A protein has these predicted regions:
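Conserved active-site alpha-helix within GNAT-family acetyltransferase domains
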Residues: 111-114, 121-148
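Conserved acetyl-CoA pyrophosphate-binding loop and the N-cap/start of the following alpha-helix
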Residues: 91-92, 96-104, 114
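Conserved acetyl-CoA binding element of GNAT-fold acetyltransferases
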Residues: 75-90
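Active-site rim helix/loop that mediates acceptor-substrate recognition in acyltransferases
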Residues: 15, 22-70
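Acidic/histidine-enriched, glycine/proline-rich intrinsically disordered or flexible terminal extensions
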Residues: 160-206
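A short beta-loop-alpha structural element at the N-terminal edge
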Residues: 2-14
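Short hydrophobic/aromatic beta-strand or adjacent loop that forms the aromatic wall/cage
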Residues: 48, 149-153
């Protein structure tokens, strides 16, 4: 197993992997592959943390990171970071690859001086990589009451003391909504991939 930086020659393979990993998981079909495709030209994209996982000679996993921010109570912006999509090919899920890729990428982020991470996810999985419910760190999720414990809004301090005295609200970076903002462009892009059936399944969020 090898983890390395994503290269331009990997782009299409990684986008197809992302599509396979997320298809019908959170909604009928998925948009994560388009988010990734568009994010590479986004100023918030962190190319040093766009990583692929190789097993048996093929790409089976990928993760990307983005700059983000917290809005403090006085209205100022405080640097934050997030990650995702993180994708593991369906044939390799539930075998520990996702956690290995995540932990590797977090270690790289820490080495780069990234102070903290915010994200939306399942605490039952992400606690194994050091995440906690963000409200315990004084962080709030946009659109929710400040005193609400939002169980899917998670955070982790990477630099000790980075969040000391900090209380703020996290807004998901706009780049993650590109498919909603440009639905026709998204549909045209998705049509370049093999046709798949969109299904409404239990547990989907959208």
């Amino acid at each position: 197993m090898e983890i390395r930086l994503e290269q331009e020659k990997d782009y299409r393979e990684v986008e197809n992997l992302t599509r396979e990993a997320f298809w019908n998981v959170y909604r009928p079909g998925c948009v994560e592959h388009y988010v990734l495709n568009q994010y590479r030209n986004n100023a918030d994209f962190i190319p040093e943390l766009s990583l692929v996982m190789i097993e048996e000679g093929k790409i089976i996993g990928h993760v990307m990171y983005s700059k983000a921010s917290l809005t403090l109570d006085d209205g100022t912006e405080f640097p934050a970071w997030t990650f995702g999509p993180i994708s593991i090919h369906p044939d390799y899920k539930r075998k520990g690859y996702g956690l290995k890729l995540l932990n590797y990428s977090i270690a790289k982020a820490r080495e780069m001086g990234i102070g903290m991470l915010c994200m939306e996810g399942n605490i039952d999985f992400y606690k194994h990589a050091g995440f906690v419910v963000a409200s315990t760190l004084g962080l709030h999720y946009h659109g929710e009451p400040k005193d609400a414990e939002v169980p899917y809004f998670l955070a982790q301090e990477l630099t000790p003391g980075y969040l000391d005295g900090i209380e703020g609200t996290y807004h998901t970076p706009r780049g993650y909504f590109v498919a909603d903002e440009h639905p026709d462009d998204f549909e045209a892009y998705d049509a370049t991939f093999p046709e798949r059936v969109k299904a409404v399944l239990d547990g989907q969020l959208f």
